[in-house]
A protein has these predicted regions:
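Helical "lid/coupling" subdomains associated with nucleotide-phosphate turnover
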Residues: 1-110
Length: 110
């Protein structure tokens, strides 16, 4: 070992194998959240699907793997690497409204 960085190529299959356990945990979390979600909202989620965001959404086959495990349609966001930052920025623009709404409704999930 030289201690210097080096590049290594791995296949999509090798990447998915390495992600088996974290994907299992994510899918279990989806099931747990849906169990605690009001039925009408859970039905909407089941009908509309799960939108996957972030750079990990670009990994080949991750949408199919999550869909197989949850039984819910999975959609990759249009711009998965940027959409979380864009949404956060939009939320900050209306932060007063969001806080007021959360306080007025005493929303248990916020």
């Amino acid at each position: 070992m030289t201690g210097l960085p080096k590049s290594v190529e791995i296949t999509s299959d090798e990447m998915m194998e390495a992600l088996e356990e974290p994907l299992f945990t994510i899918c279990e979390a989806v099931h747990n959240v849906l169990e605690r979600t009001p039925p009408e909202l859970a039905a909407d989620i089941s009908n509309s699907g799960i939108i996957v965001t972030g750079g990990g959404a670009l990994m080949y086959g991750i949408d199919k793997r999550i869909q197989e495990r949850t039984g819910i349609k999975v959609i990759i966001a249009e711009d998965p690497k940027s959409c979380v930052a864009i949404g956060t920025g939009k939320s900050l623009d209306i932060l007063d409204k969001l806080e007021s709404n959360a306080l007025n409704r005493r929303a248990p999930y916020l």
